[in-house]
Amino acid sequence: MKKFKVGIIGCGRISPFHSMPAKAQECVNLVACCDVDIEKAKDRAKLFGCKKVYTDFEEMIKKEKLDVVHICLPHYLHSPVAVRALELGCNVLTEKPMAISMKQAKAMIDAEKKSGKTLGVIFQNRYNAGSQLVRKCLDSGLLGKIKAAKCNVTWCRKPEYYTSSNWKGTWDMEGGGAIIDQAIHTIDLMCWFIGYGKNGANLDYVDVSIANRAHHDIHNASGALVDVEDSADGLIAFKNGVKASFWCMNYYSFDDQVEITLDCEYGNVKVTAEEAVVTLYDGRSFSAKPDPSDTFDYGGGPSYWGASHAKQIDDFYAALEDGEEPEISGKLIYATTHKMIMALYDSGKSGKPVKF
């Protein structure tokens, strides 16, 4: 069995959700981690069980002759680091969002094509038990056609969320606020259920409003004024006739459970957090929720993030071993989710609908 030499770039809060599932793969040798803060890298290296630490990711890739890197960095660094890693001959799995612009994302796709390597992007909630049940019921025709959809995300991001970070809260570094950082997974799931179509062909137009209502007088740790949206609502219209509404905000009093509702020909769907209930008009119903035994020890981090990071990482390495595209590839996300998220911002900033 080929052993992939793997490195972690970025040793912040999300890094255990990449390193520990990667380390658990029989085909992986987790050899090094990298962070501009060497002490942070050393601390994570102990948790991850890797012997080498670096402050320069290019040096790490070259010296360790890495096959794969996981990118766990601030949003604005996803693209430049992924592009360079691909150029150096590494396969790449990056955290969401793919990038903070279409130009950045296109550079990643071009680098992947030129290198012949594989690029994947984390959208782990598609692997949740509830998500898989809904997908199965839709694909089987049990629910018929979707007629309409809606979702909402009402979470809490206190001032400390921004004041403790030197990059969050700015368009240049975070790329947005409540949409790209908090609601992106829920909006993606809703659109995945509806169906993006090949290369996003089913997307018709979006019409969005964004605002900064509760964080506009806050500065982040670098002194930059928080100017990204903390609330957004709008319409995502599809060419198959489905109109989907969304609402998100990050100044609620607590992190409430996200919700997705689908109104279908033969029934309806309600997704609440990771649990899904499918109710058919003939009286039948189906449900799925996280199995208490279906857990993964990430060695730290919020337990409510569940085991789905590990499931997507399993798929990524299985695809590398088989020489196939991962289920959630960079090319797929570029043509669908990323294009849609960027359109939401284009509409929100301009105050006008944006056509695909």
Where are the regions that the model predicts?
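Hydrophobic residues in well-ordered beta-strands that form the structural core
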Residues: 54, 94, 119-121, 246, ...
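C-terminal helix-rich "cap/oligomerization" subdomain common to oxidoreductases
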Residues: 1, 68-70, 106, 239, ...
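N-terminal Rossmann-like dinucleotide-binding module
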Residues: 1-48
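Rossmann-fold dehydrogenase core element
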Residues: 107-125, 144-151
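Contiguous beta-strand/loop segments that form the cofactor/metal-binding neighborhood of enzyme cores
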Residues: 188-277, 310-325, 342
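Beta-loop-alpha module in the N-terminal Rossmann-like domain of NAD(P)-dependent dehydrogenases
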Residues: 18, 48-111, 308
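Predominantly a Rossmann-like dinucleotide-binding segment in NAD(P)-dependent oxidoreductases
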Residues: 125-225, 351
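Active-site loop of classical SDR/Rossmann-like NAD(P)-dependent oxidoreductases
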Residues: 36, 301-313
